[in-house]
Amino acid sequence: MQVFTGTDKVKRGLAQMLKGGVIMDVTNAEQAEIAEEAGAVAVMALERVPADIRAEGGVARMADPKKIKEIMSAVSIPVMAKVRIGHFVEAQILEALGVDFIDESEVLTPADEKYHINKHAFKVPFVCGARDLGEALRRIAEGAAMIRTKGEAGTGNVVEAVRHMRQIMDEIRSLVLLPDEELVAKAKELGAPLDLIIETKKLGRLPVVNFAAGGIATPADAALMMHLGADGVFVGSGIFKSKNPRKRARAIVLAVTYYDDPYVLAEISEDLGEPMPGIDVRKLSESELLQVRGW
């Protein structure tokens, strides 16, 4: 029997299995266990949550393999880990460790300011960030099996995630209405392959799952992103930078499931303790923005 391990179809199918769920950033085995108990569909293993990366500065790299293995041993749900944009050797290391997904992430300090990783060269599926349809389709062309909005990680401010999700969804709606004879010009405008433009127009959505990420800190934030068309939610600093991580983690998982029921949302949002401190994105300089990394 022919086995199709590592094909685009298989990798996209693995990402589809996470649909409707919450993926949580964790920095140790204890946090990973809290995330799993709360109902997370996967965890993202990293050295520091985005809020700490933003506050401490310096160069942010792939997490220590020892830490990643400890997290993998602690939970039964899929484990993801981040690599720097363009750093294919970090990705090779993570694949050798046996992680379930690799996130080529703008949250870490880019290793290559010109090229992203050729993700087709790997058997493990990749997730990548995007601010608009062009970015999303370029990452998919490189082999990404999953897209997430970039938002502005580590701020606790959902405004950029909202902007990016609305932008992607608006562009898809416009593409669906575009006459076929204009698709080649649209592909040139977006810097994306024509076959992906045609597929997206036919589907009326991205060819891969599209999660929301970047600044999601409350159950209401998570529910909002689901209303805007997200297939699920990444939560970075919002859980473990809050006063009651265990309770907030569970509430955000429930919010993604019951995003269309304001009565349930009201109940699960009660008495969660202080959320993570937020940052006004408008006060960040261009050099402080993480979302501008990549192309």
UniProtKB/Swiss-Prot annotation:
It catalyses: aldehydo-D-ribose 5-phosphate + D-glyceraldehyde 3-phosphate + L-glutamine = pyridoxal 5'-phosphate + L-glutamate + phosphate + 3 H2O + H(+). The keyword Phosphoprotein does not apply. D-glyceraldehyde 3-phosphate binds at residue 166. The keyword Ligase does not apply. Keywords: Lyase, Pyridoxal phosphate, Schiff base. Pathway: Cofactor biosynthesis; pyridoxal 5'-phosphate biosynthesis. The active site is at 82 (schiff-base intermediate with d-ribose 5-phosphate). InterPro entries: Aldolase_TIM, PdxS/SNZ, PdxS/SNZ_N, RibuloseP-bd_barrel. It holds the Pfam family SOR_SNZ. GO terms for biological process: amino acid metabolic process; pyridoxal phosphate biosynthetic process; pyridoxine biosynthetic process. Its EC number is 4.3.3.6. GO terms for molecular function: amine-lyase activity; pyridoxal 5'-phosphate synthase (glutamine hydrolysing) activity. D-ribose 5-phosphate binds at residues 25, 154, 215, 236-237. Belongs to the PdxS/SNZ family. In the presence of PdxT, forms a dodecamer of heterodimers. Catalyzes the formation of pyridoxal 5'-phosphate from ribose 5-phosphate (RBP), glyceraldehyde 3-phosphate (G3P) and ammonia. The ammonia is provided by the PdxT subunit. Can also use ribulose 5-phosphate and dihydroxyacetone phosphate as substrates, resulting from enzyme-catalyzed isomerization of RBP and G3P, respectively. This is Pyridoxal 5'-phosphate synthase subunit PdxS. It comes from Dictyoglomus turgidum (strain DSM 6724 / Z-1310). The gene is pdxS.
